[in-house]
Amino acid sequence: MVFWRDIPAQVKARQGRERAARGLDPRFQEAVDAAAMRAGLTDTDHYLAEWRTSAWEERPGSPEQAADQRAAEIEAEYSAERLRAIVENGGKEL
């Protein structure tokens, strides 16, 4: 997973040399942008410094299947209210 602070932005999966990546619904990028503005992190260096990746996790299936499944889970786990609360806290989950 790729995050800006605590906001997920992309799912990545791999198996050997095979890789897959899935962007999330545009509301996640909109939340990243709004949280960055709220936190005052509008210059490139500070904005880029907040991106991080999580540890890889094992999942069954091909990288494409795993990425699709995890992306669907993330989109279901992050309601509009949850994202709004994270944005209001400058991109950090309470």
Residues covered by each model-derived region:
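Acidic, aromatic-enriched beta-alpha/helix-loop junctions
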Residues: G16-T53
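Mid-chain, well-packed structural core segment of small domains
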Residues: A49-D68
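C-terminal charged interaction modules
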Residues: Q65-L94
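Residue-level marker of positions within ordered structural domains that often coincide
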Residues: V11, D33, S79
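Short, charged/polar N-terminal "headpieces" of proteins
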Residues: M1-R19
